[in-house]
């Protein structure tokens, strides 16, 4: 079965429809009055369809725009962790360098002091 329903009538077709008269048939004025109500309903349905179609288009466009913004935001978020990682790595290297300077610098100072003492001791004996 087809999921899409097709509208077979429109307000103009309903208005132009003429019925044959038969003996003891329906009252033509009553039929016309009822068909006028049907026409108003069809017009209301068409207005609702037009409004909903416009809303649907507007919302579809909004979803597309938000998806574009989300994609752009995701690409920015991908760059930020790399920058943060680079900054963190730089900080770690800086701290490591300071620690090496502190630890090995003290040893170098001790070694330089010992070397100077030996040189001084050696020059005293000369």
UniProtKB/Swiss-Prot annotation:
Annotated localization: Cytoplasm
Keyword annotations: Cell cycle, Cell division, Cell shape, Coiled coil, Cytoplasm
Keyword Cell cycle: yes
InterPro entries on file: Cell_cycle_GpsB, DivIVA_domain, DivIVA_fam
Gene Ontology, cellular component aspect: cytoplasm
Domain of life, per lineage: Bacteria
Coiled coil: 35-72
GO process terms (BP): cell division; regulation of cell shape
One Pfam family linked to the record: DivIVA
Stored NCBIfam families: DivI1A_domain, PRK14127.1
Family: Belongs to the GpsB family.
Assembly with partners or alone: Forms polymers through the coiled coil domains. Interacts with PBP1, MreC and EzrA.
Job description of the protein: Divisome component that associates with the complex late in its assembly, after the Z-ring is formed, and is dependent on DivIC and PBP2B for its recruitment to the divisome. Together with EzrA, is a key component of the system that regulates PBP1 localization during cell cycle progression. Its main role could be the removal of PBP1 from the cell pole after pole maturation is completed. Also contributes to the recruitment of PBP1 to the division complex. Not essential for septum formation.
UniProt xrefs under HAMAP family: GpsB (MF_02011)
Protein known as: Cell cycle protein GpsB
Biological source species: Latilactobacillus sakei subsp. sakei (strain 23K) (Lactobacillus sakei subsp. sakei)
Lineage start: Bacteria, Bacillati, Bacillota, Bacilli, Lactobacillales
């Amino acid at each position: 079965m087809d999921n899409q329903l097709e509208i077979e009538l429109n307000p103009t077709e309903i208005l132009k429809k003429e019925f044959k008269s038969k003996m003891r048939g329906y009252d033509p004025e009553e039929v016309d009055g009822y068909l006028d109500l049907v026409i108003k309903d069809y017009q209301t349905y068409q207005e609702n369809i037009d409004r909903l179609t416009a809303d649907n288009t507007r919302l579809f466009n909004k979803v597309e725009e938000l998806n574009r913004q989300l994609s752009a935001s995701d690409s920015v978020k991908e760059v930020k962790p790399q920058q943060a990682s680079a900054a963190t790595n730089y900080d770690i290297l800086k701290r490591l360098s300071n620690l090496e300077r502190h630890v090995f610098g003290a040893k170098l100072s001790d070694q330089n002091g010992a070397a100077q003492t030996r040189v001084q001791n050696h020059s005293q004996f000369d």
